Amino acid sequence: MEYNPFHNGHLYHLTSARELVRPDYTIAVMSGNFCQRGEPAVIDKFARAEIALRMGIDVVLELPVVFATQDAGGFAFGAVSVLDATGVVTDVVFGSESNDIGFLQRVAQILYEQPDEYQKFLHEELKKGYSFPNARKYALMRYFSMKGWNEEEVLRLEKSNDILGVEYIHSALKIGSNIRFHTIKRVGAEEKDTSFRGRFSSATAIRNLIREERWEEVRDSLPEDSFEILMREINEGRGPVFLENMGDFLLSFFRLKNMEFFERIHGFSEGLEKRFHICARQTGSYQDFLECVKAKRFTFSRIRRLALFSVFEVNKEFVEKSNAKGPQYIRILGFTEKGRKILSLMRKKAKLPIVTNMSLYRKVLEKTDLPVDKQLFFEQIDLDVRTTNFYSMFFPAVEQRCGERDFSIHPIFLRTET
């Protein structure tokens, strides 16, 4: 989840998931300060974790930045890996447009098994110049048509939440997880819908409302506790944070770099390093830069992710290793009184070391006897810390911009049982 911000659709998802599964506890794995679309969260991860706890989540875990800022496949792999590593998660419920878990499982099985016909179609679509996500979508459509699936089923692959659901299941297959997956129908506006649609407006629309300071409409779109904490963060100068706040810095940074620098960064291929190098010098605003780099095969989300990978100097080897070995720790952002009980069980069953107090993360690694890649552990945590330090520089209030928030802020503890 991203909870950027936590809106009425998220509350509907949480309530429906509880009714469907009847869990003893609820655990959410949440992006930190940067999200899958290559943008900063509108308020920081600690405030968003607090909202999630108030809304009924028992434990909030952080999805390491290296996964939170990848495409749907990398995002899902990181999230499922973290949940599986807790040793206590039995069921995962996600929202989807189709609400058809059987369909999503069939698609995931194809991606896992990689049949020859599908691989042939994928190669052909990539040669046409499509981005990988689109090439894969069209290859799957051709494969399903060949197998006699009806057109309505095939068109489901156009929907972003169905795609992400497929990736969750695919990731579980890859790591051999026994987690059971369920889906509920997504309600409200499409994610990319930028218009206010009442109580169930999209996260994109809500962020636009925040940007425009249309507070009554924001209030209508969020649960009361979510709105209250959002306004607290804004009034105290810790938000909102938007990509445009970072634009001048990012463009200046790109102008300082040569093409060889971009070639070392994860995700650069197909001439993108040249486009970044040239467009940074030919444009005067970050939005114009994005438009300049954009081409048929490159989505805006991919370009924004590459921009973040560049400024954080995330190299290809680090991401490849992370995607091969998965997250190397479980970071606790917050928990309730009830959640403290499941944390105790997690400490006995977890497959990865649990980091609660970031000041002690080195000691956590020293004491663990779990199979962890120590270098990767440090590299993943280092990226989380650096990106938090970067993010806080864009708080509106200068006095709030001090770094090392990962060390100065302890996990949120909500004393009232939910």
UniProtKB/Swiss-Prot annotation:
It is found in: Cytoplasm. PANTHER family: TRNA(MET) CYTIDINE ACETATE LIGASE. It is an enzyme of class 6 (ligase). One of its GO terms (cellular component) is cytoplasm. The keyword Zinc does not apply. GO terms for biological process: tRNA modification. Belongs to the TmcAL family. It comes from the Bacteria. This is tRNA(Met) cytidine acetate ligase. It catalyses: cytidine(34) in elongator tRNA(Met) + acetate + ATP = N(4)-acetylcytidine(34) in elongator tRNA(Met) + AMP + diphosphate. ATP binds at G95, N161, R186. Catalyzes the formation of N(4)-acetylcytidine (ac(4)C) at the wobble position of elongator tRNA(Met), using acetate and ATP as substrates. First activates an acetate ion to form acetyladenylate (Ac-AMP) and then transfers the acetyl group to tRNA to form ac(4)C34. Its EC number is 6.3.4.-. Keywords: ATP-binding, Cytoplasm, Ligase, Nucleotide-binding, RNA-binding, tRNA processing, tRNA-binding. It comes from Thermotoga petrophila (strain ATCC BAA-488 / DSM 13995 / JCM 10881 / RKU-1). The gene is tmcAL.
